[in-house]
Amino acid sequence: MMKLKSNQTRTYDGDGYKKRAACLCFRSESEEEVLLVSSSRHPDRWIVPGGGMEPEEEPGTAAVREVCEEAGVKGTLGRLVGIFENQERKHRTYVYVLIVTEVLEDWEDSVSIGRKREWFKIEDAINVLQCHKPVQASYFETLRQGYSANNGTPLVAPTYSVSAQSSMPGIR
């Protein structure tokens, strides 16, 4: 299913959830620093770069496209962290790891809407996301669980259902 928004086509899965893709963009393979971008709706808040998938677009391709548009970075797409449901907003987001190899000086959203980007230590990123984007904060917990459960790499990408209302989202 598709719906037209003023500047894009939104795609939905069979359950009516908007199909999205995002990346945890790390400065290096050590995955100690992650890149967050300012929200287009609330420029004083930080978010994980990502957005809606286009018709017929694969999740990994969408994730790479979105981070280039929103964060102005390119890199090596890594593992799928998981597929996260935001029941409140009816989104399903495929979240990947991306190791940044190129940082653009000017990029689409910096020019069009003045979007900013900043590197954060993982704990700091979790803290800034927790109050207004708890679903996104949960990406990092899932990343940690994947490391411990499978010695560094998740074998199967699980689907997580989280409520954006809780201060510490529960994974069901």
Swiss-Prot record:
Residues spanned by motif Nudix box: 51-72
Any one Gene Ontology cellular component term annotated for this protein: nucleus
Active-site residues, as the UniProt record annotates them: 69
Residues the record lists as binding substrate: 10, 18-20, 39-41, 89-91, 115, 133
One MF term in the entry's GO annotations: inositol diphosphate tetrakisphosphate diphosphatase activity
EC number: 3.6.1.52, 3.6.1.61, 3.6.1.10, 3.6.1.62
Catalytic activity: diphospho-myo-inositol polyphosphate + H2O = myo-inositol polyphosphate + phosphate; 5-diphospho-1D-myo-inositol 1,2,3,4,6-pentakisphosphate + H2O = 1D-myo-inositol hexakisphosphate + phosphate + H(+); 3,5-bis(diphospho)-1D-myo-inositol 1,2,4,6-tetrakisphosphate + H2O = 3-diphospho-1D-myo-inositol 1,2,4,5,6-pentakisphosphate + phosphate + 2 H(+); [phosphate](n+1) + n H2O = (n+1) phosphate + n H(+)
Annotated Mg(2+) 3 binding sites: 66
Stored InterPro entries: DDP-like_NUDIX, NUDIX_hydrolase-like_dom_sf, NUDIX_hydrolase_CS, NUDIX_hydrolase_dom
Subcellular location: Cytoplasm; Nucleus
Keywords: Acetylation, Cytoplasm, Hydrolase, Magnesium, Metal-binding, Nucleus
Disulphide linkage map: none
Positions that bind Mg(2+) 1: 50, 70
UniProt feature coiled coil, ranges: none
Cofactor: Mg(2+); Mn(2+); Zn(2+)
Major site of localization recorded for this protein: cytoplasm
Gene Ontology terms describing biological process: adenosine 5'-(hexahydrogen pentaphosphate) catabolic process; diadenosine hexaphosphate catabolic process; diadenosine pentaphosphate catabolic process; diphosphoinositol polyphosphate catabolic process; diphosphoinositol polyphosphate metabolic process; RNA decapping
Subunit structure, as described in the record: Monomer.
Similarity annotation: Belongs to the Nudix hydrolase family. DIPP subfamily.
Protein name: Diphosphoinositol polyphosphate phosphohydrolase 1
Native source organism of the sequence: Bos taurus (Bovine)
